[in-house]
Amino acid sequence: MTQSKNKVVIFLGPPGAGKGTQAERLAREQNLAKISTGDILRDHVARGTALGQRVKPILDAGQLVPDDILIALIRDRLAGMEPVRVIFDGFPRTCAQAEALDMLLEELGAPVSAVPLLEVPDETLIERIVERGRQAALRGEPVRSDDTEEVARRRQQVYREQTQPLIDYYAARGHLQHVNGVGTPDEVYNRILQVVR
């Protein structure tokens, strides 16, 4: 696939699976725009915007932000993009979001190219998330409010309950590719490249 062609990659996996790290690298190396609804929302919270004030209690509680807010953010981000070359990290999380995204991508003539699902055992995920918070604190950086064990466990449960149907949705469409998310970042990245050609 040449750089001038549409390419839409959707990263799936539980919180702490490494989606953000891998999406950043893939975006850089394949000239794709990374769209992370989590990053966009945290930026709004940090800036104290009206949207940030609305979603802060939701994020702090480890809950998922309502679809209407996320879909509006994505529509705005994709507006005018030509060609559409993007990686989604943290969106969609529900079948309703996936259907809305599919409709938007159809309007743009840019169907989903690949959906890698990063798979990591729950206890490894919790350890990664808590360690991410510890490392940020050691560096004197702000610690994400969701980088605690309690919130991380709640997020894992919410993920399982609300995201499994999405995994089934993409599997039924032949887009889903299972990727072992355990190993060094390079090992995981090389596995991702095998499914995102």
Swiss-Prot record:
Keyword field contains Transferase: yes
Residues holding ATP: 16-21, 132, 183
Segments of this protein annotated with the region NMP: 36-65
Main localization (coarse): cytoplasm
Localization terms from the record: Cytoplasm
Entry EC number(s): 2.7.4.3
Highest taxon of the lineage: Bacteria
Positions of AMP binding: 37, 42, 63-65, 90-93, 97, 144, 155
Region of interest called LID, as start-end residue ranges on this chain: 131-147
Molecular function GO terms recorded: adenylate kinase activity; ATP binding
GO biological process, one term: AMP salvage
PROSITE patterns associated with the record: ADENYLATE_KINASE
GO cellular component: cytoplasm
CDD domains found in the cross-reference section: ADK
Quaternary context: Monomer.
Domain notes: Consists of three domains, a large central CORE domain and two small peripheral domains, NMPbind and LID, which undergo movements during catalysis. The LID domain closes over the site of phosphoryl transfer upon ATP binding. Assembling and dissambling the active center during each catalytic cycle provides an effective means to prevent ATP hydrolysis.
Family note: Belongs to the adenylate kinase family.
Job of this protein: Catalyzes the reversible transfer of the terminal phosphate group between ATP and AMP. Plays an important role in cellular energy homeostasis and in adenine nucleotide metabolism.
Name by which UniProt lists this protein: Adenylate kinase
